[in-house]
Amino acid sequence: MALKTSEKALNTLCIDVGGTGVKIMLLDSAGKPLTERLRLPTPEDPTPTRVLAAVEKLKAQVPKFDRVAVGFPGVVKHGVIYTAANLHPEWVNFNLQTELEKRWKKPVRVANDAAVQGYAAIQGKGVEMILTLGTGLGSAIYTEGHLCPGLELAHHPWIKGKTYEDFLGKRGFKKYGPKRWNKLLASAIQQTAATFNWEQLYLGGGNAKEIHFKLDKNIQVISNEDGLLGGAALWQHDS
């Protein structure tokens, strides 16, 4: 979504924490990249200490910044992590916003990673939804460009007591194989359309490239870099 023209000339350090990789990029006030995307593998046993050590290594490679935007794979409220199913239990109740502000002396906003990615893609009209297909399953929904907080479709029961993430996350892809996974995804898309009445759906994440069925005109596969590019827009919305 286009940024407001009144936005001050502030550079945003965007961080995308994922189950397999930690990425950063520096954006200008218009949301355009000032650096290439930098990446390190998510550490084994990904505790806050280990993941933040990787973030620090990446941060050392970028120029000065004015503020920080973080996308995190779980439920986030006011900078505090409430769920981290694909990382480590130590993340639960960890105040990531406060920790980074203390370290870097810069203002920080933290939000669900799918929500941040969606900000880079949405048009700000009607009901729009994003599903991210990666290590887990991310989800976010927006009305007229505003995020509806709290959606965590991944762990909602779907088929025979198993969750959407059980089928559509990385483990589900490996278990069921590409053909079955695509059928499950098509079914999930139909379910979300009936439940949320979205007008536009965006599909992101590393496994979006594995989609092999024809998508309707109002369904769009988006770049994985949008997980970083949405960071500047996060500063124009409530986190």
Regions found by a protein language model. Give the residues of each.
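Short beta-strand scaffold segments in enzyme catalytic cores
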Residues: 22-26, 74, 119, 137-143, ...
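Short glycine-rich, Thr/Ser-proximal phosphate-binding strand/loop in the N-terminal lobe
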Residues: 2-50, 81-83, 146-174
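Glycine-rich phosphate-binding loops at beta-strand->alpha-helix junctions
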Residues: 21, 192-224
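Short glycine-aspartate micro-motif
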Residues: 12-16, 67-69, 128-132, 202
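Glycine-rich phosphate-binding loop and adjoining helix at the ATP-binding site
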Residues: 36-60, 64-68, 75-127, 167, ...
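A short, acidic, amphipathic alpha-helical segment used as a generic capping/interface helix at domain edges
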Residues: 181-194
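Glycine-rich phosphate-binding loop plus the immediately following alpha-helix
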Residues: 96-114, 147-184
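Short glycine-rich phosphate-binding loop at a beta-alpha junction
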Residues: 64-73, 199-206
